[in-house]
């Protein structure tokens, strides 16, 4: 399996000279050749639209603060609590896509990393940090809507702009801390059988596989998704409960458009990232040799690569969702005209 060798080598336990999976699983070479040809262009396309879309989103959120931008404005617009979270999510997506050109080149070179050890660690660490930052921000966004809609009378005492800003800061710090192992353990090593110098994770001990699974699949997915499902279930229940009362109101319940935007963002995030975490868990089972069948190893390996880049799509989908499913950007755009 190419990605097993290139991403999670254990030089203390397995020889770099003869990875068993390379010689025993040759049936998917044509599939890998196709991926090497197709995925780099796909990743660059995602990077282009992700950069363009998220830069536009951030400009619409942040530029009204700049007095020199529109001298005729009578007052400055302050970001709402929802906008603070969404601006941070756009910033996270922007930082995330900045690392994609390096991986596009890496795949185009058949995992031969040409940028050196420092960029190997920095690019991998930044991508890993933003994986956590993104899902933690989705939890925070869902929790904020939950408080506003399910406990509207008491939420005003808790929902403060400074609190939202502090929450976002803590999320960025948490993402950085959780990415430290990636910064420390990523390195460029020669893999003779593949004739490449690969940017890989070098685990010093078998137990690191379990630690990585807990970090990635539990802290980075299962626990946040449980919270997201809980909050959004009650949000939908609250909206259903308000439906009868809002029938006579023009436009429906207060905040329903913003809530619709956020629910769409949450659904998009889960659809894009669930396959990645599913195959990441299967990859963990391969690493600890619970899965040993060659065909399953190839399915896991190829599936993880495809799911990886399917997850990247989320970074350029979010700006489209802001425009087509929500009123926040429309309000900001009209305010600058």
Swiss-Prot record:
Record-level Gene Ontology MF annotations: bradykinin receptor activity; peptide binding
Database matches in InterPro entries: Brdyknn_1_rcpt, Brdyknn_rcpt, CCR1-9-like, GPCR_Rhodpsn, GPCR_Rhodpsn_7TM
Gene3D superfamilies: Rhodopsin 7-helix transmembrane proteins
GO-annotated cellular components: plasma membrane
Chain ranges on the Extracellular side, renumbered to this chain: 1-41, 105-121, 186-217, 283-305
Compartment(s) of residence: Cell membrane
Membrane-related topology note: Multi-pass membrane protein
Cytoplasmic side: 63-83, 143-164, 239-261, 327-337
Induction of its expression: By lipopolysaccharide (LPS), four hours after treatment levels show an increase in many tissues. After 12 hours maximum levels are observed in the heart.
Disulfide bonds listed in the record: 120-199
Keywords (A to Z) from UniProt: Cell membrane, Disulfide bond, G-protein coupled receptor, Glycoprotein, Membrane, Receptor, Transducer, Transmembrane, Transmembrane helix
Domain of life from the UniProt record: Eukaryota
Record protein name field: B1 bradykinin receptor
Job description of the protein: This is a receptor for bradykinin. Could be a factor in chronic pain and inflammation.
Entry keyword annotation includes Glycoprotein: yes
Residue spans crossing the bilayer: 42-62, 84-104, 122-142, 165-185, 218-238, 262-282, 306-326
Free-text tissue specificity from the UniProt record: Expressed in bladder, lung, duodenum, kidney, uterus, thymus, salivary gland, testis, prostate, macrophages, aorta, spleen and heart.
Gene Ontology terms: biological process: cell migration; cyclooxygenase pathway; G protein-coupled receptor signaling pathway; inflammatory response; negative regulation of blood pressure; negative regulation of cell growth; positive regulation of leukocyte migration; positive regulation of release of sequestered calcium ion into cytosol
């Amino acid at each position: 399996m190419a990605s097993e060798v290139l991403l999670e080598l254990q030089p203390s336990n397995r020889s770099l000279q003869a990875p068993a999976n390379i010689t025993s699983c040759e049936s998917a070479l044509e599939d890998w050749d196709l991926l090497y040809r197709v995925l780099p262009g796909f990743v660059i396309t995602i990077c282009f639209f992700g950069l363009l879309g998220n830069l536009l989103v951030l400009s619409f959120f942040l530029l009204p603060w700049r007095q020199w931008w529109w001298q005729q404005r009578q007052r400055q617009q302050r970001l709402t609590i929802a906008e603070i979270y969404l601006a941070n999510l756009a910033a996270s997506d922007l930082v995330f896509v900045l690392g994609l050109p390096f991986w596009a080149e890496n795949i185009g070179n058949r995992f031969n990393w040409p940028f050196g050890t420092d960029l190997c660690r920095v690019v991998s660490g930044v991508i890993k940090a933003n994986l956590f930052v993104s899902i933690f921000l989705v939890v925070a966004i869902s929790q904020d809507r939950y408080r506003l809609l399910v406990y509207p009378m008491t939420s005003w005492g808790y929902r403060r702009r400074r609190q939202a800003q502090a929450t976002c800061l803590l999320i960025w710090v948490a993402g950085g801390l959780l990415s430290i192992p990636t910064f420390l353990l990523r390195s460029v090593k020669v893999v003779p059988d593949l004739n490449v110098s690969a940017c890989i994770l070098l685990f010093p001990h078998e137990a690191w596989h379990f630690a990585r699974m807990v970090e990635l699949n539990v802290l980075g997915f299962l626990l946040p998704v449980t919270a997201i499902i809980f909050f959004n279930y009650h949000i939908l229940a609250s909206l259903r409960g308000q439906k009868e009362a809002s029938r006579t109101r023009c436009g429906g319940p207060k905040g329903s458009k913003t809530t619709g935007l956020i629910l769409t963002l949450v659904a998009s995030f889960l659809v894009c990232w669930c396959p990645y975490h599913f195959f990441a868990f299967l990859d963990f089972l391969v690493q600890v040799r619970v899965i040993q069948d060659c065909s399953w190893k190839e399915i896991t390996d190829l599936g993880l690569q495809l799911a990886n880049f399917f997850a990247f799509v989320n970074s350029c989908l979010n700006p489209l969702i802001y425009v087509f499913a929500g009123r926040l950007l429309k309000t900001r755009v009209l305010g600058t005209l």
